[in-house]
Amino acid sequence: VLNPGRTVDAIEPGFHNDPRRSLYHWYFLRKWRRSLTLKSRLFPGLIDLDAVRQHPSIRSLTEYFVPRYTEFACADDYLSGYAVTGSRLAGLKIPATIIASADDPVIPARDLGQVARPSCLCLEKHSHGGHCGFIPDFRMESWINKRLETLFQPRDKSQGGPDE
């Protein structure tokens, strides 16, 4: 996620007419509620499940939880707290790569232009890839697996790195 607030907005009902985004909203909200139900069983009294059921969206549920369970006053402060847009990555000192897709229905591609670009940051923007790992067919094979293997290979000391 580059800008969590904009990602939440991208999948919220009413912000779009893209059925893929509605599917993601349904999936994430269902998964979050299931997790909260499990936590309430493990920690009785911690979570008010009746209140959880009253929130029909990820944004409204985030707005409910943030002031109650975090040090942030509101959802927007919380969401912007872990955004990597703006100058957040300007001080990056180690090699890093962001791999993104222009057609991702969840993470707006226009947010890539809002990311600081220190010399150690590589930004790979691809035309297609969606949100699920650049899967081109029903065999579930993707070039991204090989790309990640390459990225996570140990670096040669002559290439520089944090130990220098």
Describe each model-derived feature in a short phrase:
Residues 83, 101, 105-111:
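Conserved alpha/beta-hydrolase "acid-adjacent" motif
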Residues 121:
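Short, conserved active-site loop motifs that form the nucleotide-linked donor/cofactor pocket
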Residues 67-88:
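Active-site nucleophile elbow and catalytic-triad environment of alpha/beta-hydrolase enzymes
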Residues 92, 98-100:
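Short beta-strand/loop motif that positions the catalytic acidic residue
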Residues 89-92, 114-118:
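Short, conserved loop/helix-junction motifs that constitute active-site signature segments
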Residues 147-158:
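C-terminal alpha-helix
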Residues 129-142:
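Catalytic histidine-centered segment of alpha/beta-hydrolase-like enzymes
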Residues 1-69:
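Alpha/beta-hydrolase-fold enzymes
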